[in-house]
């Protein structure tokens, strides 16, 4: 069973919310492009601030002889770049990009993006734009089945989200070590509860005791393990977590992201496991892509964070990445 306790509200009170990008339209009904700037950090980086850009827009038929037909909303993560240009200048150039979109398939359904226009202020982000990029369609597209194959598709940028990376040092994106399992270890996870201002899709409609629309997601932070054969108790781990002085914030990496900063003392084992860094970033694009799509331009706010202490999954438990369960008969073969 899990032991759960609440973090104090001060752990996320400063930067635990993201403002919405409210829809504004021209007289003909077209959406007016807008930009949003998020800074989940401390603002202590001495050199020019690095920025992560995330584009949100519409995939539409690219036919010069007729008005464009919008198919579905989608996104294009541009990644990190350095620039002194103002957000409005970056948005202006993004709206005139000639980004082509193509639907294809690999291990899963994918979208291919390629920009044909010359770049100026967006040159620091040219790797994704001019070299071409391929993304998991479910992560960057609202409804991929609506994208046709018999029409050229153009990605028209409507909104831009800029995340300022203003902390000193780098950020760890946990990908492999959350799968680390060990005997007699206690897994330290965090359960994050967020509140929406805009209504998400139906299956996220969960009301808390105050009748507010909420959703939850969980991230793995690390393991507490003793050298001896016996296991730490949850009561022993709790003060260790409190000494870490964890501070939480919301950013816009990959759409919406959870940023965790350790301001206090961290155990040597846990610190080494996290690459000797005290800045962690969890993009919801990797953790919960369905929820992430609902938060692309919505206002959301952290309302509760809980520390969840659970026994680590035993090492002899196998992790299955797909529905093809290996069998002794050899009827299925993974290519």
Curated annotation (Swiss-Prot):
GO cellular component, one term: viral envelope
Pfam families: Matrix_Paramyxo_C, Matrix_Paramyxo_N
GO molecular-function terms, A-Z: structural constituent of virion
BP GO annotations: virion assembly
InterPro entries: Matrix_C, Matrix_N, Matrix_Paramyxo_C, Matrix_Paramyxo_N
Location(s) in or outside the cell: Virion
Keyword terms: Viral envelope protein, Viral matrix protein, Virion
Family the UniProt entry places it in: Belongs to the morbillivirus/respirovirus/rubulavirus M protein family.
Function: The M protein has a crucial role in virus assembly and interacts with the RNP complex as well as with the viral membrane.
Name recorded for this polypeptide: Matrix protein
Organism: Rinderpest virus (strain Kabete O) (RDV)
UniProt gene name: M
